[in-house]
Amino acid sequence: MAEDLDELLDEVESKFCRPDPLRLGTVERPRGGGGGFFGHDQNRAEAKENLRSAETFEKEDDLDSLINEIFEEPHFDKKHFKLKSKSSGNTSVRASIQGLGKSCSPVYIGGSTVPCGIGTNASPRACDHLRCTACDFWVESYDDYRWDKSCDYLFFRNNMPEFHKLKTKLVKKKGTRAYACQCSWKAVEELTDLQTDHQLRWVCGKH
């Protein structure tokens, strides 16, 4: 390995670090001191430094090539690859967190004419992310239907949430929305605040 390195250094010296013949005569040292001359050692050190610089540039070129390959990937979207400052990044993350997990307040249900979404006092909407705290089941809703009077607990317990089974107890009624979980069911036409119905244990499961 050492011999290969010496050969490489000699080749670099011959190409890039040829000593000035006039200068060699002034810096030549006695042969008895191990042979050679001081200029030769200095040129060898310079060659090593040049070799290190060449290796550094080669690594930087390889890194640039790798980055270019990444950006040229067919599935890489440059629009989403943006470097942001630390402060702007924190702001974006904070805004994203605040945009998640919003709950209705108060929680409304309503007929098929009532729009669904996040309900508030200023913008009353029927919650479409209801969850029952009694059976721990998501509440399903069906527009323009009401439940047949023969419905019972076992029917919903055995058939939720498969619509092809539930529809045997669904009756068409324009403007009505039928709600049900595995333990409770209700059909309404008007906007209704769930706080007024103490039998239903439905809460907003967050949007």
Curated annotation (Swiss-Prot):
Residues 1-75 are annotated as: Required for interaction with FAM161A. May be involved in photoreceptor outer segment disk morphogenesis. This is Cilia- and flagella-associated protein 418. It comes from Bos taurus (Bovine). GO terms for cellular component: cytoplasm; cytosol; photoreceptor inner segment. The keyword RNA-binding does not apply. InterPro entries: CFAP418. It is found in: Cytoplasm; Photoreceptor inner segment. The gene is CFAP418. Its main location: cytoplasm. It holds the Pfam family RMP. PANTHER family: CILIA- AND FLAGELLA-ASSOCIATED PROTEIN 418 (PTHR33958:SF1), PROTEIN C8ORF37 (PTHR33958). Keywords: Cytoplasm. Interacts (via N-terminus) with FAM161A (via central region); the interaction is direct. Signal peptide: none annotated. Expressed in the retina (at protein level). One of its GO terms (biological process) is photoreceptor cell morphogenesis.
